[in-house]
């Protein structure tokens, strides 16, 4: 009971954060609000506290039998669900069949185990396309810029990326060099026209 009480307190604290994010970005398509619990009932109890925050709240559950049971119930009530901790195509299939709006394969963590994280995104995307699944593939645990491009190339619908990767996506040595050349040419032109 102590753990359940602690989980409930965390959920209330997280609820305030999710509410604040939802208020700042009211038209954002989806904000994933994670629930925890050992049983589907515990997850559903926490989800109930989060659903009414706004229409852009998506309930995030783990890819476990109890998480998929909660996913099934939530999706039947037309609540968007993100099934997370996906490490195989088989798990993604189960989540999709349970009504998941999104599945979140963990690209970086798959690579950590010497498997092909991008290959996993491609396999899931191909299976979903073949069967006309409505579930979207959300590539998670992205750690490098190239993984973003590759994930989208092989069929990811969405990528969640840390801010350091997002910032690196803007940077390229040739862009910096090009800006230096433009600046130098502009100063030269101003000098020639006598406008400096």
Where do the model's predicted regions map?
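Single conserved hydrophobic/aromatic residue that forms the stacking wall/gate
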Residues: 1-12
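Glycine-rich phosphate-binding active-site loops on the catalytic face of alpha/beta enzymes
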Residues: 9, 85, 102-113, 156-175
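Catalytic beta/alpha-barrel core
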Residues: 9, 32-39, 56-65, 80-93, ...
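Acidic (Asp/Glu)-rich catalytic clusters
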Residues: 15-28, 48-53, 96-99, 153
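Alpha-helix-loop-beta-strand connector modules within alpha/beta enzyme cores
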Residues: 15-31, 68-79, 117-137, 183-193
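Catalytic cores of alpha/beta
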Residues: 42-46, 70, 88-98, 143-157
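Glycine-enriched alpha-helix->loop->beta-strand junction motifs that scaffold or abut catalytic
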Residues: 53-57, 73-82, 97-104, 153-159
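C-terminal alpha-helical cap/extension of soluble enzyme domains
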Residues: 128-196
């Amino acid at each position: 009971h102590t753990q359940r009480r602690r989980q409930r307190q965390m959920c209330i604290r997280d609820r305030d954060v999710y509410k604040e994010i939802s208020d700042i970005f009211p038209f954002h398509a989806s904000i994933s609000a994670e629930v925890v619990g050992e049983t589907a009932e515990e997850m559903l109890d926490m989800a109930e506290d989060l659903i009414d925050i706004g229409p852009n709240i998506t309930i995030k559950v783990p890819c476990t039998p109890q998480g998929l049971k909660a996913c099934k119930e939530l999706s039947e009530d037309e609540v968007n669900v993100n099934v997370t901790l996906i490490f195989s195509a088989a798990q993604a299939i189960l989540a999709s069949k349970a009504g998941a709006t999104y599945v979140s394969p963990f690209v970086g963590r798959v690579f950590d185990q010497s498997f092909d994280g991008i290959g996993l995104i491609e396999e899931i995307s191909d299976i979903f396309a073949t069967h006309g699944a409505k579930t979207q593939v959300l590539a998670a645990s992205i750690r490098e810029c190239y993984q973003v491009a590759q994930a989208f190339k092989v069929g990811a619908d969405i990528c969640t990326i840390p801010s350091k990767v997002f910032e690196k996506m803007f940077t390229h040595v040739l862009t910096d060099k090009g800006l230096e050349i433009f600046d130098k040419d502009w100063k030269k032109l101003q000098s020639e026209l006598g406008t400096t």
